[in-house]
Amino acid sequence: MSKVGVVPLIFLVLLSIAALQNGDDPRRQRDEKQSPQGDILRSTLTKYSYNIQRRCWAGGSPCHLCSSSQVCIAPTGHPAIMCGRCVPILT
C-alpha cells in the first residue's frame, strides 16, 4: 500500500476511536433516554394508586399479601389480580 493510501486509513481509524470516546455510541444514548411511554405509565400509576389501595381495603386485601400456599379469590369467586381474599390452595 502506498503512503497516500495509508495516511487516510490511519486518519479514519483515529477519527473512529475519538468518536467512540466522545460518547457517540448509540447504545449508550438509547439507555440514557427515557421513553415517553414509561413517563406516562409512571404518572398514571402514581395518580391512581391511592384509589386502587382504597378499593382493596374496602373489598378485601391486596393479593400480593397472600403466601405461596394461598390463592387470591375475588368476591365473585373468580381468581383476583389486585384485591380479594387469601384462601388456602386445596391439594
Swiss-Prot record:
Transmembrane segments: none annotated. Residues 24-55 form a propeptide. It is found in: Secreted. Disulfide bonds join 56-72, 63-83, 66-86. Its main location: secreted. GO terms for cellular component: extracellular region. GO terms for molecular function: toxin activity. Residues 1-23 form the signal peptide. The keyword Chaperone does not apply. Expressed by the venom duct. It comes from the Eukaryota. Keywords: Cleavage on pair of basic residues, Disulfide bond, Neurotoxin, Secreted, Signal, Toxin. The cysteine framework is IX (C-C-C-C-C-C). Belongs to the conotoxin M superfamily. Probable neurotoxin. This is Conotoxin Im9.1. It comes from Conus imperialis.
